[in-house]
Amino acid sequence: MKKTLFLLLTLVGFSVQASSVLSMKERSVLIDNILEQRFSDVLPHIMEREGIDMWVLMSREYNEDPVLKTMLPSTWISARRHTMLVIYNPGNGQPLERLAVARYAVGSLFKKAWDKEAQPDQWEALKHIIEARNPSKIAINTSDSFALADGMTSTEHDKFMAVLPEALKSRVVSGERLSIGWLETRSDLEMQYYPVLTQIGHSLIATAFSNEVITPNVTTTDDVVWWLRDQTRALGLTNWFHPTVSIQRQDNEVFDQISAFSKRPGENIIRPGDLIHVDFGITYLRLNTDQQQHAYVLKPGEKDAPASLKEALKSGNQLQDILTGNFKVGRTGNTILSMSRQQAIEQGITPAIYTHPLGFHGHAAGPTIGMWDAQEGVPVQGDYPVFAQTAYSIELNAASFIKEWNKEIRIMLEEDAFFDGQTVTYLDGRQTEFHLIHSDKNQ
């Protein structure tokens, strides 16, 4: 009977999550609609902001520029042969011209602009297209500091510069800020669906951190990790990193930040009195989540987590409020980090802040707001400013002394949020109470 009830509860939870997930065909239509909106509404603004009127991107099959890959139609899994894309802004409010200097049109997004029979040399065809438009600046994806903006290979760069006439070579510039702007800026249509993705992630964590999945003194942390992997795949989604589930408990072990962030936790049996932590992220509609929450395993007879643990969670939430309150357009990641740390310390919090942009990638392009091992700031990536219409993984931890355990623990939180230029809003709320797991069999 108990096994039947467990299966029923699991299936009910699964059906609720699955009802939020579109079929592959429905996803395809939506992804292409999102891309069309991004090209019509998002990209023109960014090109004008950065003063660039032509953007040239290229990829060879299975060696994709990470930016170009986000521009491909839903039915294109990768570039084909040698895909060259030209995006030209003619100005005066006219639509962007999107050309594929390739054997194929790139769906309906990029019009085929190379007739191989008339001009067998693809590079020459690209040169003629550029010359005909005579752009003032030609952006290519090269960057010393932002990996996602450095997608043009050395071979492609050499060939590209070799084919350009001298008059155009001086107009070639790094498309670093253009790439970051494209990757970090979220469209209105994307933001209609991003909360759904974060809700699915929260729902999976809530089930994982319940008696539906965890039986104290039996279930291991690795069992929960693989349950999350299996359920993600069962929903037709993917994980962009392998989840971690770790434990802090009343023992003599001291929290070691280097080990916590550089080593995977070992398999551990979950026991009454444990404080459990999960780090979990999924990918859906080409967007990503990155979430961390905590659960407490009630000891027999307990109805709630110890008071000190609940106060520790409040301290973590307070640190979140301090950080998100310091977001301002034009303010750099390093400035936000410094302000937030100073304010937190003044309020009696021991903070560690390592917040990052979120979107097409889990660790996405945009301003880095600290790293766990760089609380003094991050050169270059941390000097990039915050823009409106951007999403972030609000990731941090706060240390607290737990008197019931006579030791210090870390409340490690991570929630996905959106900055509209004025306010940071969590996409599906945030954790303010522990997930509770019962040890008593009759509960």
Kindly label every feature range from the protein language model:
Residues 1-4:
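Positively charged n-region of N-terminal signal peptides that target proteins for export
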Residues 13-15:
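N-terminal signal peptide c-region/cleavage motif recognized by signal peptidases
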